[in-house]
Design a protein with these regions (language model features):
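Terminal targeting signals and extreme-terminal segments of soluble enzymes
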Residues: 1-187
Length: 187
């Protein structure tokens, strides 16, 4: 089972127990591999319903065993300090090849694990700015810039948009950490 799926579904389960507060933090632990042939049961522990914060703990269970746990917190929206890093100077997503175009161009020459990955339909499309890490095993800087978007239409529900982002969070973090070591998630 793709870890991002479990993250996203866990956040959906937690968000359904909270009214009118966006998630502001989450922390996840993967404990066992999931079995894609059976359903996952999500148990939500309502830790506290405070004036400002609403923490939840979610455990994903299969075969009677915890495969994943998430601690997350929802917060009343309020004014506070705001900062962000400037957007890097990168091509716009429409100026980059789509995943379908990348598949056409590289799938026949790609290693088997890369082919299997690209052959799967996913609910989130990634358009990487730099493709070197897919084929190279050179040591690269441990950073990656990608554009992401849902492949289908999402409902007009900010909580669902946050859950899709949680899903996508598991799509590039591990590979980025391996770049410096000349490794890939496909190894």
């Amino acid at each position: 089972v793709f870890g991002g799926l479990v993250i996203g579904q866990s956040l959906v389960a937690a968000a359904r127990t909270v009214e009118g507060r966006p998630v502001h933090s989450l922390h996840c632990y993967f404990m066992l591999p999931g079995d894609p042939t059976i359903p996952i049961v999500y148990q939500v522990d309502r830790i506290r319903d405070g004036k400002s914060f609403t923490p939840r703990r979610v455990v994903a269970i299969q075969h009677g065993r915890a495969i994943f746990s998430m601690s997350c917190s929802f917060q009343v929206e309020e004014e506070g300090l705001d900062h962000q890093i400037a957007m890097p100077d990168v091509p716009a997503p429409e100026d980059l090849p789509s995943e379908a175009k990348l598949r056409e161009a590289f799938i026949n020459s790609a290693p088997e694990p890369v082919r299997r990955y690209w052959e799967q339909d996913r609910p989130v499309e990634i358009r990487p700015i730099d493709l070197r890490h897919y084929m190279s095993r050179d040591s690269l800087a441990p950073r990656q810039t990608v554009w992401i978007r849902a492949t289908g239409r999402l409902p007009d529900d900010p909580a669902i948009h946050r859950c899709v982002l949680a899903y996508a969070s598991d799509m590039t973090l591990l590979d980025t950490s391996l770049f410096y070591h000349g490794r890939s998630v496909f190894d």
